[in-house]
C-alpha cells in the first residue's frame, strides 16, 4: 500500500513524486511509456526551455487566477534555478526571459530522475492502467503489472498534444469518471495554417521572421503579445503566434502590427532617401 500513486512520468509527475517522496511519503510513479519524459526530451529543440524568468499569474489562462498566484508564489522560477544549480546544470537566457539548458534536455530528465530516487520513489514504467477504482481504503489501479493500491492518487498524464509520443485522453476520462469539472479541450500553443491556395501569394516569405504586436479577444479573454512572428510555407508560426493561439477563438480577428512602435511613413521616407543617395547617376551607368 502506497501513500501516493502518481500517474504520468513527465515533468509534472516526476516533480510531484519527488517532492512527495522527499517529504517521507511512500510513492509509486506509473507510466505506460518505457522512457521517461518524452515531451521534455523534444522541448526547446532538444535543449528544454524549462522556464521563463518573467513568468507570472498574468501569463496563465484560468477561471481561478488566485490559484496561479498561490502556485507561482509557492514555487518560483528562481526556486527551479536553485535546483539546477544543485545539480550543476548550466543554462542561458535566449530571448525575452526564455531559459534553456546549455546542453541537452536529457540533463533535466536525469535531474528529475535523481530527485525521485532521493525520495525513494518506486518506478512502474511500461505499465498500462486498465482501470482505476476508489473505495474506503483509497485507490486501486488495475494494471498490466498487477494491482497497485494507494491512499491518494495524482493524475499528471498531460493533454492530447503530440499523440506520436504516446499522449492520450486518459487523464480527461479519469477526471470525468470521478465527476470533476472538465474544460472542453482545444488546441493551444499551435501555429496557424491556411488553405494552400489562399496562402500561395505569401508562401515566398517562408523563413522570414520579424517582431510584431498581436492582439485578439475582448476583456478578460483578451490577449496581446510583443513577440517574434515567423512566416512558414503553410502559414504563420513563431512565439507570437503560439502565444496568441491560446486566446483566439474561431471567428475572432487577430490584429497584427508588423511595425510596433515605429512610424511606417518615416521608415519609408528614410528608405527612399537612402536609395536616392546610393543609386548611381545615368552618367555613372554610361561610363561603367
Which role does the model predict for each range below?
Residues 6, 10-12, 35, 159-161:
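Residue-level detector of alpha-helix initiation sites
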Residues 152-196:
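Glycine-rich loop(s) and the adjacent beta-strand/alpha-helix scaffold that form part
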Residues 7, 148-160, 229-230:
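Short hydrophobic core segments
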Residues 125-137:
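A conserved short coil-to-beta-strand element within the FAD-binding core of flavoproteins
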Residues 69-75, 95-113, 162-166:
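Short beta-strand to alpha-helix junction loop
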Residues 4-28:
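N-terminal Rossmann-like FAD-binding beta1-loop-alpha1 element of flavoenzymes
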Residues 33-36, 41-42, 51-57, 90, ...:
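An anion/pyrophosphate-binding glycine-rich loop and adjacent beta-alpha core
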Residues 47-92:
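Glycine-rich active-site loop/strand segments that organize a redox cofactor
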Amino acid at each position: 500500500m502506497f501513500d501516493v500513486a502518481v500517474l504520468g512520468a513527465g515533468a509534472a509527475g516526476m516533480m510531484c513524486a519527488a517532492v512527495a517522496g522527499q517529504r517521507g511519503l511512500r510513492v509509486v510513479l506509473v507510466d505506460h511509456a518505457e522512457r521517461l519524459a518524452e515531451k521534455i526530451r523534444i522541448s526547446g529543440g532538444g535543449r528544454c526551455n524549462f522556464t521563463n524568468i518573467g513568468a507570472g499569474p498574468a501569463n496563465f489562462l484560468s477561471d481561478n487566477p488566485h490559484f496561479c498566484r498561490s502556485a507561482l508564489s509557492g514555487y518560483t522560477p528562481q526556486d527551479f534555478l536553485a535546483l539546477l544549480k544543485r545539480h550543476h546544470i548550466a543554462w542561458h537566457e535566449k530571448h525575452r526571459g526564455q531559459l534553456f539548458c546549455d546542453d541537452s534536455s536529457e540533463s533535466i530528465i536525469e535531474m528529475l530522475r535523481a530527485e525521485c530516487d532521493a525520495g525513494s520513489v518506486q518506478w512502474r514504467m511500461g505499465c498500462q492502467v486498465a482501470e482505476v477504482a476508489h473505495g474506503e481504503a483509497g485507490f486501486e489501479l488495475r494494471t498490466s503489472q498487477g494491482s497497485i493500491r494507494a491512499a491518494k492518487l495524482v493524475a499528471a498524464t498531460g493533454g492530447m498534444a503530440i499523440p506520436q509520443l504516446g499522449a492520450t485522453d486518459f487523464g480527461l476520462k479519469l477526471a470525468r469518471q470521478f465527476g470533476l469539472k472538465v474544460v472542453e479541450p482545444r488546441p493551444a500553443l499551435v501555429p496557424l495554417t491556411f488553405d494552400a491556395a489562399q496562402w500561395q501569394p505569401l508562401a515566398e516569405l517562408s523563413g522570414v521572421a520579424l517582431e510584431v504586436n498581436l492582439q485578439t479577444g475582448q476583456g478578460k479573454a483578451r490577449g496581446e503579445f510583443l513577440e517574434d512572428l515567423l512566416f512558414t510555407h503553410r502559414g504563420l508560426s513563431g512565439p507570437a503566434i503560439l502565444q496568441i493561439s491560446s486566446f483566439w477563438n474561431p471567428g475572432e480577428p487577430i490584429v497584427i502590427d508588423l511595425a510596433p512602435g515605429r512610424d511606417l511613413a518615416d521608415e519609408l521616407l528614410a528608405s527612399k532617401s537612402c536609395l536616392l543617395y546610393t543609386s548611381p547617376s545615368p552618367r555613372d551607368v554610361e561610363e561603367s
